[in-house]
Amino acid sequence: MINPELRDGRADGFIHRIVPKLIQNWKIGLMCFLSIIITTVCIIMIATWSKHAKPVACSGDWLGVRDKCFYFSDDTRNWTASKIFCSLQKAELAQIDTQEDMEFLKRYAGTDMHWIGLSRKQGDSWKWTNGTTFNGWFEIIGNGSFAFLSADGVHSSRGFIDIKWICSKPKYFL
């Protein structure tokens, strides 16, 4: 008969208890190591991609300023029809977020009036066509419900008059 005790006095079952724990710890260690490697590779890839990201040029009749493309119509329509036109171009009536945008739009629009993407219901605050509330950083002159840009600033009117319009959409990065 074989003696189940080893020379140091421990039972043979000791090895059967320790080996599975060693294998389990080894697997956990390997998984942690692989997780660190995968995370590091992802961070490096994202950082490299971000450095090489370039804005796509605005196409056709669209003009690029900063991170936006603008379209100035030659045709005239009411505010709602202008909004629909912009939507069909995957754009919105122009949203003016900065003084730089405002100066560019006024300079390019010249003396013509152009619908922009601000409207309000009677007694409500002004909202952009994307649903965000206008923060009031420029004055809107008049008591109408639809905003338009002219050479001397932003005015409001009833939306049924036919004037030119400006669409805007973001430049997309690749």
From Swiss-Prot:
GO terms for molecular function: carbohydrate binding; identical protein binding; protein homodimerization activity. Glycans are attached at N78, N130, N143. The chain crosses the membrane at residues 28-48. N-glycosylated. It holds the Pfam family Lectin_C. SMART domains: CLECT. The keyword Ligase does not apply. InterPro entries: C-type_lectin-like, C-type_lectin-like/link_sf, C-type_lectin/matrix_domain, CTDL_fold, NKR-like_CTLD. The gene is CLEC2A. The keyword Transmembrane applies. Disulfide bonds join C58-C69, C86-C167. Induction: By phytohemagglutinin (PHA) in peripheral CD8(+) T cells. Residues 65-174 form the C-type lectin domain. CDD domains: CLECT_NK_receptors_like. Changing N130A: Partial loss of glycosylation. It is a single-pass type II membrane protein. It is found in: Cell membrane. PROSITE patterns: C_TYPE_LECTIN_2. GO terms for cellular component: external side of plasma membrane; plasma membrane. This is C-type lectin domain family 2 member A. Mainly expressed in skin. Also expressed in keratinocytes, spleen, thymus, small intestine, peripheral blood monocytes, bone marrow, ovary, testis and skin. High expression in CD8(+), B-lymphocytes and naive CD4(+) T-cells. Restricted mostly to proliferating lymphocytes. Not detected in myeloid leukocytes or natural killer (NK) cells. Its main location: membrane. Keywords: Cell membrane, Disulfide bond, Glycoprotein, Lectin, Membrane, Receptor, Signal-anchor, Transmembrane, Transmembrane helix. The lineage of its organism: Eukaryota, Metazoa, Chordata, Craniata, Vertebrata. Residues 1-27 are cytoplasmic. Homodimer; non-disulfide-linked. Interacts with KLRB1. Interacts with KLRF2. Membrane-bound protein expressed mainly on keratinocytes which acts as a ligand to stimulate the activating receptor NKp65/KLRF2, expressed on the surface of natural killer (NK) cells. Facilitates thereby dedicated immune recognition of keratinocytes leading to natural killer cell mediated cytotoxicity. Also plays a role in modulating the extent of T-cell expansion.
